């Protein structure tokens, strides 16, 4: 183990660092952010929330100016950092971690694939006849990696470590699939000149990588250029975060480089960026929700997609991998554990809200979809925690383990 990776290990963290990096704390901050937004927008002070939501903000450099409402800076600017971190995690896992061998990949990969296809199929079964609503097919296919892992962390030693590894890998595959969907399904009006500029920026990042440049500033400056080019190209800007991440070298001069960036960035993303996104997107004004639509095909397609589709799809994927003998269930992980994890994968929250914002433009439809995402996610979270708690009670090896 290199010096930097040792410094980043939990054993070398202070008590405060361990708290700040705790998935449970990240989940709590995220939950509080959503609740504050929800109660604020349904209070007599709702106008002040809307004022913050749509406050104008601009970046000016000489004659160049990029002006957008604050909500778009959060969704298209700060969230790039979130997807950049996901890109770093995927690259690290592919080269050195849980996704570095075919046997390790198969089980969570099949689970993630099933967990995306079945929810999408359920949504389309309800909404295939509606040209307006059919764009939302990817909303129930997403998983909130931060909240799902935070819920699992709440159970501590009551769940085996192998289950945490499985859910992490599943969520990484799920996020990768969501990124591909966003790039292919929600990109419009492509601009060839901007795409060429983005390609040139990416080439510059690759050159920096091959030269093993150790200056993070260099990657940031070129990365901003790539982000602006992608933003102007018509391809959704989230793709820029992953492109930049994959151009970061694993090591420079024998020292950890990618892992250190990931380590330093994680608490900022978990405790600031994701909660900010949740705060700006979870303000659901119940007075503006069309409950006829909520209890109709649109709302039910999302709720059932998240709560039913995710668990069915993940378990079908796991079962298929095991039957085909290309993946194996870890010895210490029971089928009950896997079912609980399958339920937790239905916690869509921030990722589903993000996709919903891309799929729908009408405020009424967005509010209805967001409420359906919250309901489906709460049902999945509750079901997952109950199943995992019962699995702990019926697992002698875990029940006798110290908390």
UniProtKB/Swiss-Prot annotation:
Q: Where found, per UniProt?
A: Cell inner membrane
Q: What is its main location?
A: membrane
Q: Where are the transmembrane segments?
A: 25-45, 70-90, 105-125, 136-156, 165-185, 188-208, 213-233, 234-254, 269-289, 302-322, 340-360, 369-389
Entry keyword Cytoplasm: no
* Cellular compartments per GO CC: plasma membrane
Catalysed transformations (reactions): Na(+)(in) + 2 H(+)(out) = Na(+)(out) + 2 H(+)(in)
What biological process terms from GO does the record include? regulation of pH
Record's keyword annotation contains Zinc-finger: no
Citing just one GO molecular function, the answer is: sodium:proton antiporter activity
Q: What membrane topology was assigned to this protein in its record?
A: Multi-pass membrane protein
Question: Which key words tag this protein in UniProt?
Answer: Antiport, Cell inner membrane, Cell membrane, Ion transport, Membrane, Sodium, Sodium transport, Transmembrane, Transmembrane helix, Transport
Q: Which InterPro entries match?
A: Na/H_antiporter_dom_sf, NhaA
Q: Name one Pfam family in it.
A: Na_H_antiport_1
Family note: Belongs to the NhaA Na(+)/H(+) (TC 2.A.33) antiporter family.
> Matching HAMAP family, A to Z?
NhaA
State the function annotated in the UniProt record.
Answer: Na(+)/H(+) antiporter that extrudes sodium in exchange for external protons.
Q: What is this protein called?
A: Na(+)/H(+) antiporter NhaA
What species is this protein from?
A: Maricaulis maris (strain MCS10) (Caulobacter maris)
């Amino acid at each position: 183990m290199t010096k930097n990776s040792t410094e980043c290990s939990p054993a070398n963290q202070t008590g405060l660092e361990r708290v700040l990096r705790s998935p449970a704390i990240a989940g709590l901050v995220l939950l509080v952010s959503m609740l504050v937004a929800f109660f604020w927008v349904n209070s007599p002070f709702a106008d002040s929330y809307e004022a913050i939501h749509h406050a104008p903000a601009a970046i000016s450099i000489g004659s160049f100016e990029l002006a957008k409402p604050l909500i778009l800076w959060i969704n298209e600017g700060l969230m790039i950092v979130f997807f950049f971190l996901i890109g770093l995690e995927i690259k690290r896992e592919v080269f050195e971690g849980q996704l570095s061998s075919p046997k390790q990949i198969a089980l969570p990969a099949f689970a993630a694939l099933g967990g995306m296809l079945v929810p999408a199929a359920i949504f389309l079964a309800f909404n295939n006849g509606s040209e307006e609503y059919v764009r939302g097919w990817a909303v129930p296919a997403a998983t909130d990696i931060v909240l799902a892992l935070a819920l699992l962390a709440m159970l501590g030693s009551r769940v085996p470590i192998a289950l945490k590894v499985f859910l992490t890998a599943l969520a990484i595959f799920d996020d990768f699939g969501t990124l591909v969907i966003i790039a292919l399904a929600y990109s419009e009006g492509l601009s060839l000149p901007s795409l060429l500029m983005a390609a040139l920026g990416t080439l510059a990042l690759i050159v920096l990588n091959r030269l093993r440049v150790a200056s993070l500033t260099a990657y940031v400056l070129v990365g901003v250029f790539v982000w602006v080019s992608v933003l102007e190209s018509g391809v959704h800007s989230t793709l820029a975060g992953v492109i930049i991440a994959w151009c970061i070298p694993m090591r420079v001069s024998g020292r950890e480089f990618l892992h250190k960036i990931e380590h330093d960035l994680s608490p900022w993303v978990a405790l600031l960026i994701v909660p900010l996104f949740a705060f700006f997107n979870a303000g659901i004004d119940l007075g503006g929700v069309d409950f006829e639509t909520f209890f109709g095909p649109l709302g039910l397609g999302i709720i059932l997609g998240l709560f039913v589709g995710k668990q069915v799809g993940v378990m079908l994927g796991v079962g298929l991998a095991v039957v085909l003998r290309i993946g194996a269930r870890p010895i210490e992980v029971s089928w009950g554990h896997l079912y609980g994890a399958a339920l937790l994968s239905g916690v869509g929250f921030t990722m589903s809200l993000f996709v919903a914002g891309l799929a729908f433009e009408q405020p009424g439809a967005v509010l209805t979809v967001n409420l359906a995402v919250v309901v489906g996610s709460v049902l999945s979270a509750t079901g997952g925690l109950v199943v995992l708690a019962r699995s702990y009670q019926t697992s002698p090896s875990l029940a006798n383990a110290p908390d």
